[in-house]
Amino acid sequence: DLSSEKRSVCLINDSFPPVIDGVANAVTNYASIIQRNYGDATVVTPYYPDADDSIYPFPVLRYPSIDVTKLVGYRAGLPLSPELMAQVEGRHIDLIHSHCPVTSTILARMLRQRLHVPLVFTYHTKFDIDIANAIHSKRLQEASIKLLVENISACDEVWTVSRGAGENLRSLGYQGDYIVMPNGVEITA
């Protein structure tokens, strides 16, 4: 019976405590529930100085980052880390779940290729607004959105947190299928 089989899920996001935002909270909650009820969760996120990951009941693997908080409010992860790849490979991951369509999903795609496991992406927010706030050139905004949509389109399955988020994703040019999967919903068999 597959429903009772324990799974190992790798959750990847560009934000995680000490940064607090809605997506970081969702990832923390996903990881806690998976770890408590369904198997093993591993969170992969950029390095932040003074982060205390020992408080979590699941491992948090951090990879190198650069400080771009003045530009976008976050540290930008540098996902080309052989050490991180080896650490994740050692966790025997069954599923990768990315929550940010930029660095996290680039890393998730590299891990999927290496581990041969499915990649789910959740679209949480209107990234076109974030891009417009961070990049003032219209041409660069359009190129960034195109890359974002290509990154999302490369995932095996796409979830959105609401119908409105799905419509926003479509308005950016995404043409694939998506499943509305509201945060905070626990699926029981």
Predicted regions and their residues:
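Structural alpha-helical scaffold elements that stabilize or flank donor/cofactor-binding regions
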Residues: Q87-E89, E150-N151
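Membrane-proximal helix-turn-helix segments that form the acceptor-binding/catalytic region
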Residues: R114, Q141-E157, L172
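A short beta-strand/loop micro-motif in the catalytic core of glycosyltransferases
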Residues: S153-S162, I179
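A short, charged, and often flexible helix/loop element on the N-terminal side
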Residues: F58-A86, S98
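Nucleotide-sugar donor phosphate/pyrophosphate-binding loop at the beta->alpha transition
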Residues: P118-V120, D128-E150, I187
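An aromatic- and histidine-rich active-site surface loop
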Residues: L95-Y123, F127-D128
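Carbohydrate-associated surface elements
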Residues: Y47, G164, G184
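N-terminal subdomain of nucleotide-sugar transferases
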Residues: D1-P64, E89-R91
